[in-house]
Amino acid sequence: MSVLKILHYPDQRLRLIAKPVEKITKEIYKITNNMIDTMYQEEGIGLAATQVNIQLQIIVIHKIHAIEKNLILINPKIIEKKGSISIEEGCLSIPEYRAFVPRFNYIKIQAINLNGNTVEIEADSILSICIQHEIDHLNGKLFIDYLSELKRERILKKLIKLKKRIK
């Protein structure tokens, strides 16, 4: 498998809306395996395909935050939601920045698994937050979109400085 390049804000490709996966193919298996390798390499807890410039509705969640194995969700949709929770979130596409974001504490998801079967998954707490965060990516939304414009401008300036330091 291989590690994919993660897009970083303000890359406009992060704002693209992912297309549904029509059929589970060998290429989809390869994409999900590469996404998992990338997530582990970058020490993330979740990753959306759009973060690695693949415009398909695929998310992966680290096994520690899923149940007992990595969670792969294709074409995920939230079909039920309730309660509220807010913890400090970070993102592989927005390095070195964290913020509190309001989320639903409980969600029920409908998605397709790698066998092509429709599944429903209930999640709460950190798993719920992680799934919502990754689904946002599929819709071209970043966690900083929940913040004020002033905070977003500060983040952008900080990331530009960070990028200059790295070069």
Curated annotation (Swiss-Prot):
Keyword Protein transport appears in the UniProt entry: no
EC number from the UniProt entry: 3.5.1.88
Keywords assigned: Hydrolase, Iron, Metal-binding, Protein biosynthesis
Active site residues of this protein: 134
Catalytic activity, reaction form: N-terminal N-formyl-L-methionyl-[peptide] + H2O = N-terminal L-methionyl-[peptide] + formate
Keyword Metal-binding in annotation: yes
Comment on bound cofactor: Binds 1 Fe(2+) ion.
One annotated GO molecular function: peptide deformylase activity
InterPro entries xref list: Peptide_deformylase, Peptide_deformylase_sf
One of the GO biological process terms: co-translational protein modification
Residues bound to Fe cation: 91, 133, 137
Names of required cofactors: Fe(2+)
Family according to the record: Belongs to the polypeptide deformylase family.
Task performed by this protein: Removes the formyl group from the N-terminal Met of newly synthesized proteins. Requires at least a dipeptide for an efficient rate of reaction. N-terminal L-methionine is a prerequisite for activity but the enzyme has broad specificity at other positions.
HAMAP family: Pep_deformylase
Stated name of the protein: Peptide deformylase
Organism: Buchnera aphidicola subsp. Schizaphis graminum (strain Sg)
